[in-house]
Every structure is written in structure tokens, then in C-alpha cells.
């Protein structure tokens, strides 16, 4: 019994979520594969550890280590960088060390660290 692609897609389209889940489990058992394992190589792009290291370097966190003596200027800088309100920015500065921004590009992260340092804070790029 052979299905053509259109008939197969039509059959899949008519299945409920539970039926699709059962189908995935049956395919995993029949062919000895795992749906989770198939997603991992696609995310890595075929590169080994070198690709993972390069991937980590594309996203950076800006960490406010210490507010310094000019807390008002640091709060203003945090508000400019994050878009937070006055109270939220003050709470972030008072709770240092804390992440100001997470998962941003290197250029943006360096600019944010520079702005915080110019305001009198101790900031780090991680």
C-alpha cells in the first residue's frame, strides 16, 4: 500500500494532536530514532564544539557589578539602556550585582557597559 505525498499530508491534516503524538511515538519505535535527537543537529548547523563556542560569543549579558558613588546618573543610564521605569531601574541598581541586559549583540553590550561606566558604575560584559 503506497501513499502519495498529497494523500499522506491530507491524512496527517485530519489527525488530532493525540493521534499525531501516537504517530511520532510509533515512528520512533519502528525506526529507532528520537524526535529530540533529530532537533539537536539542526540547531548546531553541523559544526562541532567550535560552532558551539562561536555561538556562545554572539550573545552577551551586561552586568551591573556596583552602582558607585553617583547612583542617580547610574539609574538614568539603566533607564536609557533598558527602558525601565524609575522604580524598576532604582531597584535594579540597589540590588547590584544584577544583569542589566541579557542575550544582546556584542556591540550593543559594549555600548551599554560604556554608558554605565561613564555614569560612575562598575559594569561587566559576560
Curated annotation (Swiss-Prot):
Coiled-coil stretches noted in the UniProt entry, renumbered to this chain: none
Protein known as: Large ribosomal subunit protein bL12
UniProt family annotation: Belongs to the bacterial ribosomal protein bL12 family.
Record note on quaternary structure: Homodimer. Part of the ribosomal stalk of the 50S ribosomal subunit. Forms a multimeric L10(L12)X complex, where L10 forms an elongated spine to which 2 to 4 L12 dimers bind in a sequential fashion. Binds GTP-bound translation factors.
UniProt GO molecular function: mRNA binding; structural constituent of ribosome
Any one of the GO CC terms: cytosolic large ribosomal subunit
Gene: rplL
Organism annotation: Paracidovorax citrulli (strain AAC00-1) (Acidovorax citrulli)
Gene Ontology BP annotations: translation
